[in-house]
């Protein structure tokens, strides 16, 4: 492994660590040992030197004076963020002595790790940490907050988390961005779409909010939250009725198309219009456009899956390319995630065999508040890393109430004293990605990339792998698996004979090339999919066995209160979840947290554009700035971004979101809450 950290000057290849599908190649400019500029790598075949504003300003985050430099011990009340510096030895001794006591008195399951992909590096997010907590026998975490519902739904149809190669979409003639603000969250897919548009391609956006991507589209279609499956079924109704389907493809590569043809007769445009808020004329127009344009491509976003019915929504949308046979056309098909193409050896990396036959209890991360407040026997210690649940998790007020428990020993490993860290007993300083050894796999394009250390550690910060090696040693765990170096971890993860796409990729080749493309000798079709039938399952017997309708179906959202407004807290352009929300430059770019309200609703409630507005339900309340217009349908309100706590302001939007779980995969239902609004 080469390390550029000791080299004082130069330009070095790197990779973006953010939880973003684009996983950009970077060039890091150093002078006198410090990063002075972050630039896109023009040699990367997909991202091609073009990077977002977040990464362009990454230097300010790396050298932010608010970064933690030493371990901290709480000296004030929980939540007040009053700490004193301590040594790493004291921190590790304090943590492990408490854990040993808890294990002796209450068992290892009284301890719970809580983490996610704030850094998408595989060692950082799911390497030595998994080994450590498996070895301990702690309670386990179901990490389902982001894409699990959609992944499960997509797999019922397609059998694998894979779609087409996005590089092929330069040939696409119709792009449908469905529930994704790609300008802000998948910018290079937009770049490709714009290239195709110069050759005549059309861009359609279906979303609850006319955001940056909606404004770029040739045609924006607003839709009521959680009704996407009804729209997809209405499109199928017309495709079959108007003979716009591909009978040969359906016969050869799918199962259940005859049953589906009969099933969708009930989803006529008039019925679907009532459900979705999309006019019958637009439903016809969209279906005709989709049925008559080839190749067509659907980019399925994360938005639709964050509903009570999110898995079924994605399962249903995933059926559409099969109806018109798009998978046989270069540039045709869909992408939800492409993580299946770059699937590495998770068993070798995470080593679940260290459980040694134990089956500890597990908890869904979306329900952290109720886990901390209601579990019996209780969780007595929480180790949090790679996430900021006091801002990011649903029912955030309940989460913070749980973190206030005096009998809860909480450790946070982070770059900053986050809102979550304010409740910790011990805080550990974390390295940035540019200080780590790691590897990254995109969940959109087909390239895997290696991260080599570019700069020296900031202060006394340590990487996740280093922290868990120290904890393992202090706990008396002598297993070699808990001593493996970062290089060994990467070698183990990339040794995956079951995935032929990685056949020519290993640690040595990645070290030489920095990034490499997965090997894909044949297209998705013709071929055999890993569904029970080996085909696209429009009718799924597996779904029936699992308690779901065998055919794609629309089911309404849960009504948890009688408030009149559906509330969708979407992402914004200059933050990534809570990352960058503490950076003054990014805050100034976003200006203020807004609530988008339809003109008719604003008039009814006496709310004017730019005025403060109270948004509330039984879970909590916020005060945001009204953005009045036609960006959302009547009965829908939308905010953008997860804003950092600020004295005297009520902008914690996840105080309003439910912690119910989605229909499939135990996913989050951020976008299925209801609220009331009123002028302040």
From Swiss-Prot:
InterPro entries tied to this protein: Asp_de-COase-like_dom_sf, MoPterin_dinucl-bd_dom, Mopterin_OxRdtase, Mopterin_OxRdtase_4Fe-4S_dom, Mopterin_OxRdtase_prok_CS, Prok_Mopterin_Oxidored, YoaE_C
Domain 4Fe-4S Mo/W bis-MGD-type: 9-66
Chain coiled-coil ranges: none
EC number of this enzyme: 1.-.-.-
Cofactor dependency: Mo-bis(molybdopterin guanine dinucleotide)
Keyword field contains Cell inner membrane: no
UniProt-recorded Gene Ontology molecular function terms: iron-sulfur cluster binding; metal ion binding; molybdopterin cofactor binding; oxidoreductase activity
Cofactor binding: number and manner: Binds 1 molybdenum-bis(molybdopterin guanine dinucleotide) (Mo-bis-MGD) cofactor per subunit.
Keyword line: Iron, Iron-sulfur, Metal-binding, Molybdenum, Oxidoreductase
PROSITE patterns assigned: 4FE4S_MOW_BIS_MGD (PS51669), MOLYBDOPTERIN_PROK_2 (PS00490)
Binding annotation for [4Fe-4S] cluster: 16, 20, 24, 52
Matching PANTHER family: OXIDOREDUCTASE YYAE-RELATED, TRIMETHYLAMINE-N-OXIDE REDUCTASE
Protein's name in the database: Probable oxidoreductase YoaE
Gene that encodes the chain: yoaE
